[in-house]
Amino acid sequence: MKILFITSTRLGDGVLSTGALDYFIRKYPEAEITVACGPLVAGIFGQAPRVTRVIALKKEYYALHWYKLWLETIGTEWDVVVDLRNSLMSRLIRAKKSYIWGRQDKQKHKVEQIAAVIDAAPPPAPTLWFNNDALAKAEALVPKGGPVLAIGPAANWPGKTWPAENFIELINRLTAADSILPAARVAVFAAPGEETTAYKVLNAIPAERRIDVIAKASPVIAAAAIQKCALYIGNDSGLMHCAAAVGTPTLGLFGPSWPQLYRPWGEHCAFVSTPETYDQLTSYPGYDQATVTGSLMASLTVTAACAAAVELWKRIPKI
């Protein structure tokens, strides 16, 4: 049995679709699965069982990447095609059964929207897979030695990045002697290009308790390292979804984005947001997303984030 699974080029959306892939892996354990996705998430899907091929789609002018994918897949008679990109290509190849992204209820979480496409109930939760090499690299990044608080202080847009000084204060509160993670080590995670923000946070942590995972790992290795941590707190980002997918208790910090769509998924997760909505944060005169250089999340207080983290931590054993 052959399955073609077409998913996102972006890390966050790609991770949110892993539950759908896992659904088909479990439903058809004999299947050979080809995944088409962006280069950034190719390593994540390459770890999955039953995935025999990953086609990394690099966006090209005139949508040539779709034409190239069509050339690579047209010669196969697919039993199932899952297209979460709603591409024309999935309609031009032979398949006995197709699941194609269409109009969705924008009030529902992305995981629920994906579940509706593939007729899965309950919605399959995102999940990640790791081979022995990935686990060994994660162990080198976050060695054993007591609980670790993982922090993701960056995001793909300055507007939805909580100020670095707030992260520093939050870390100090949560690792205080009378708090939930007294004297815990702190691992700071960030991707290449996010070093400036991330190092502001890392350098404020006592040297003996800091773990530097800034621009030092691919998404799949970073996710494996987060799996070793006791708690993850970070901005709305692909890394936040990785943390949730590996089962680490995850607190997402939201400002000018949509928690109803993109909050971290799972009972082991929570989110806290600015008092203002996306529209309220971005409706000021002269707003242009391309020219925003600073955080739009100043109204999310450290006290609110700390309270949400403590509440999440206290309810985890009850899950």
Tell where the protein language model's regions lie, with residue ranges.
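Catalytic machinery of carbohydrate-active enzymes
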Residues: 1-319
